[in-house]
Amino acid sequence: QPLTRKDYGKIINTKHFDRLLGLIDSNKVVCGGSSDRNTLQIEPTVMDNVTFGDAVMQEEIFGPVLPVLTYDSINEAVNNIHAMSHPLALYIFTEDKHVAKDVIARIGFGGGCINDTLIHLATSEMPFGGFGESGMGGYHGKTGFDTFTHYKSIVDKKTWLDLPIRYQPYKKINNKLLHMFLK
């Protein structure tokens, strides 16, 4: 009973709460699905027999809703994913390292896990972020600092030395000297 626990998380605001409820098709819920608008809580919800046409598959979820889609082959799954915009994350569950490597190589996504979910967000050593429709850049740790930092490059040329070699007309000796310095 997650909704009765004091330590169970809340949805950030009513707009997001209502958006999430709009993604849940009660006819496809196999567990969870309860919610409390007063506390902005939604029970972890698993939906089965989901298709790419369902509302829950039309946008990134960012909430306690797990749509389950089934496939007859990995190629079918990859082709269906390619028909959509790039996912922010990809989670593949398999014991077969070759299948995992193949899927990861064939699908563009921001970050992900093999045989787990969300754990890639827990380390500041790994950047997280999307590309394409899911965003740009990376966040977390040094990568996040670098993403949101503007580096200002400056050259402080002293005025007491202004080499004529920099200016036209160029002479053959100038080219030879430049090549010698650039080696």
Residues covered by each model-derived region:
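Basic phosphate/pyrophosphate-binding loop/patch that engages nucleotide-derived ligands
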Residues: 22-28
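Flexible, acidic loop-helix segments that line cofactor/substrate-binding pockets
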Residues: 1-22, 34-41, 58-63, 124-125, ...
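Short secondary-structure junctions
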Residues: 28-34
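Conserved C-terminal structural/oligomerization subdomain of aldehyde/semialdehyde dehydrogenase
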Residues: 41-183
